Design a protein with these regions (language model features):
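Metal-dependent nucleotidyltransferase catalytic core
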Residues: 1-34, 40-87
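Context-gated lysine
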Residues: 6, 12, 33, 47, ...
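Conserved NTP/Mg2+-binding pocket subregion across the NTase superfamily
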Residues: 50-135
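Conserved nucleotidyltransferase catalytic core and NTase-mimicking acidic/glycine-rich helix/loop elements
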Residues: 111-170
Length: 170
């Protein structure tokens, strides 16, 4: 049995879920020995985070009560599942969640040219502050490096889905 199958079995036994959406590297086929296992579990269970280790793989699994998706919720909170793999979906909750997230992404306005220019000005200002070569300068270097991926996506008029996907788009 492969590790993903063992993890899915663990999730089913532990949470008796209505739905499971796997996202990230185990969903897109880029998992390696250092990958964690990202998933959203919808179950008659309290909201929690499961960071158990199964056969050396760390879980990054978010469990949400079914009620979360039966009332109004912010789809931005769940944007990571937009292209995830639905493993289990007893009542089409996962299907509706993905659809709602995709609609949210499509409705998200792109940044204007002025907003992008402001972001680029901010980058230049931050890079100039890194020249101090002190603790604050090193912090600002990290900050601009982190934010530059999202700014790159803004420039290219792409939705930012996180660092791994942004790096692949480059």
């Amino acid at each position: 049995m492969e590790i993903a199958d063992k993890i899915i079995s663990y999730l089913k036994e532990t949470y008796q879920p209505d739905a499971i959406i796997v996202y990230g590297s185990f969903s897109d086929g880029s998992a390696n020995k250092n990958s964690d296992f990202d998933a959203l579990v919808i179950a008659s269970h309290s909201k929690e985070h499961d960071s158990s280790v199964i056969d050396g793989t760390i879980l990054d699994v978010f469990i949400y009560p079914v009620d979360t998706f039966l009332s109004e919720y912010d789809p931005e909170e769940f944007v990571q599942v937009w292209d995830g793999t639905i493993i289990l979906d007893k009542n089409r909750i996962a299907e509706h969640l993905q659809k709602r997230v995709l609609e949210y992404i499509e409705r998200t306005p792109q940044k204007t040219d002025d907003e992008i220019l402001q972001e680029l000005d901010w980058c230049e200002k931050m890079v100039s502050r890194t020249l101090r070569e002190d603790t604050e300068g090193y912090y600002r270097w990290h900050w601009v490096l982190f934010d530059s991926l999202e700014i790159y996506c803004d420039i290219k008029h792409l939705h930012y889905y996180g660092p791994k996907k942004a790096l692949r788009q480059m």
